[in-house]
Amino acid sequence: MWELVALLLLTLAYLFWPKRRCPGAKYPKSLLSLPLVGSLPFLPRHGHMHNNFFKLQKKYGPIYSVRMGTKTTVIVGHHQLAKEVLIKKGKDFSGRPQMATLDIASNNRKGIAFADSGAHWQLHRRLAMATFALFKDGDQKLEKIICQEISTLCDMLATHNGQSIDISFPVFVAVTNVISLICFNTSYKNGDPELNVIQNYNEGIIDNLSKDSLVDLVPWLKIFPNKTLEKLKSHVKIRNDLLNKILENYKEKFRSDSITNMLDTLMQAKMNSDNGNAGPDQDSELLSDNHILTTIGDIFGAGVETTTSVVKWTLAFLLHNPQVKKKLYEEIDQNVGFSRTPTISDRNRLLLLEATIREVLRLRPVAPMLIPHKANVDSSIGEFAVDKGTEVIINLWALHHNEKEWHQPDQFMPERFLNPAGTQLISPSVSYLPFGAGPRSCIGEILARQELFLIMAWLLQRFDLEVPDDGQLPSLEGIPKVVFLIDSFKVKIKVRQAWREAQAEGST
């Protein structure tokens, strides 16, 4: 009996002990590792993972490896090495590792965000980027769409004049409508129950993707019941059912001679492929309804929660730093005034606001650790070998909080992005990648930057944004999920007297 147990343990140890493919190669320094559990017993048990990995750099250097369950993962925490992974060797490291939770969220590795590199990922990324090009000019200009939704947002907030409210849902509605217009040319009215459905499944997917699921680290655990996976499947099904309903309804009104949104772009690509009018890289099988709705789901998931979260982080930092907020009001008043609403061209004038947004993205990046990459081939990072199939994580938190790159990195200092005179935006460090880089960079970066600037400019022009009467400031600790969330908080909304007077003058 004991001989069999010993044999089983030795077999498991052999199967799950990390192996080197190139005996003479130099690999990154590694944390201690045990069979089956890997380095898990030796990782810090408290605190945010991105910060714990950052602290481990002091002992192991800017690149090191950990054995996460049965997988070897390389952690990269320096901008030069990160750019090598993302840009210089972007093709080598453009893969996505297979993980149980990501497979569920991506309908078995479809879409863009969690799909492995290959023909389907390249095709859908290219089509998504082509869609954003539709919104450069004319009636569909991105700025026009964003501003019409912000106008509705501001009108709604004005009805809460003098009240302390959580602005999460109002901002969520505005950002959701922008994405919906880009994807379907439709938007939701306030009170539409579908908005709550979208918010609930978004939150459910983000929450369950981010839980410390052993099944992602030890894949064979999938054979056992798993509450996290079941909850994730439930939320993904709700998302898929909703998007499938939208897709089926849209098919009836699709016109191939009028391509105006993302769904049009994807459906036209499928039609061309079915008719033999597409290139060899545009296989019809890669444009099934399931592929299409997963890509739309990715755009919704990435575009809504990220922007909403950054707006809330920005407001939170301004409530904590009233002196910066005061300067922003002065900048708005002097450069925009109250006779017109802010436009994207005001980015050249509202430099402190732009610097503030950049500083928020540095201090609280949307994703403190980028979605894991995977080595598609045997490659290297710096002087170290990286075997094919190895998972690579870019610790963006480490890049953005490196004391050698940033003066007082934990302090909120928007002025670091301005020259001493405050008349020009600057790049104080190359260790700054808020939207990633290379083949896997965020395709919605332009949209996100426009939304963040315009939302904040409009809010600051119209409202005094104050700490509630109870004096409760937002927590800046954060909740690290797939997106770095902030705890719910309230802000006191007061319509600015100068704005009110300007509107009264304009109506006479």
UniProtKB/Swiss-Prot annotation:
Q: Which InterPro entries match?
A: Cyt_P450, Cyt_P450_CS, Cyt_P450_E_grp-I, Cyt_P450_sf
* Activity regulation, free text: Regulated predominantly by intracellular cAMP levels. The 17,20-lyase activity is stimulated by cytochrome b5, which acts as an allosteric effector increasing the Vmax of the lyase activity.
Specify the effect of R358Q: In AH5; selectively ablates 17,20-lyase activity, while preserving most 17alpha-hydroxylase activity
* Residues binding heme: C442
- Involved pathway(s): Steroid hormone biosynthesis; Steroid biosynthesis; glucocorticoid biosynthesis
Task: Tell me its EC number(s), please.
Answer: 1.14.14.19, 1.14.14.32
Q: How is it modified after translation?
A: Phosphorylation is necessary for 17,20-lyase, but not for 17-alpha-hydroxylase activity.
What's the short name of a Pfam family annotated to this entry?
A: p450
Q: Which UniProt keywords apply?
A: Congenital adrenal hyperplasia, Disease variant, Endoplasmic reticulum, Heme, Iron, Lipid metabolism, Lyase, Membrane, Metal-binding, Microsome, Monooxygenase, Oxidoreductase, Phosphoprotein, Steroidogenesis
Q: List the catalytic activities from the record.
A: a C21-steroid + reduced [NADPH--hemoprotein reductase] + O2 = a 17alpha-hydroxy-C21-steroid + oxidized [NADPH--hemoprotein reductase] + H2O + H(+); progesterone + reduced [NADPH--hemoprotein reductase] + O2 = 17alpha-hydroxyprogesterone + oxidized [NADPH--hemoprotein reductase] + H2O + H(+); pregnenolone + reduced [NADPH--hemoprotein reductase] + O2 = 17alpha-hydroxypregnenolone + oxidized [NADPH--hemoprotein reductase] + H2O + H(+); 17alpha-hydroxyprogesterone + reduced [NADPH--hemoprotein reductase] + O2 = androst-4-ene-3,17-dione + acetate + oxidized [NADPH--hemoprotein reductase] + H2O + 2 H(+)
* One cellular-component annotation, GO: endoplasmic reticulum membrane
Among the GO molecular function terms of this UniProt record, one is: lyase activity
Which coenzymes or cofactors are required?
Answer: heme
Any GO BP annotation: progesterone metabolic process
Superkingdom of source: Eukaryota
Translocase found in the keyword field: no
Q: Where does substrate bind?
A: N202
Q: Where in the cell is it found?
A: Endoplasmic reticulum membrane; Microsome membrane
Changing R347H: reported impact? Answer: In AH5; selectively ablates 17,20-lyase activity, while preserving most 17alpha-hydroxylase activity
Instruction: Give the UniProt family note.
Output: Belongs to the cytochrome P450 family.
Disease field reads:
Adrenal hyperplasia 5: A form of congenital adrenal hyperplasia, a common recessive disease due to defective synthesis of cortisol. Congenital adrenal hyperplasia is characterized by androgen excess leading to ambiguous genitalia in affected females, rapid somatic growth during childhood in both sexes with premature closure of the epiphyses and short adult stature.
Q: What does this protein do?
A: A cytochrome P450 monooxygenase involved in corticoid and androgen biosynthesis. Catalyzes 17-alpha hydroxylation of C21 steroids, which is common for both pathways. A second oxidative step, required only for androgen synthesis, involves an acyl-carbon cleavage. The 17-alpha hydroxy intermediates, as part of adrenal glucocorticoids biosynthesis pathway, are precursors of cortisol.
Record protein name field: Steroid 17-alpha-hydroxylase/17,20 lyase
Organism, by scientific name, is Homo sapiens
What gene, per UniProt, encodes this protein? CYP17A1
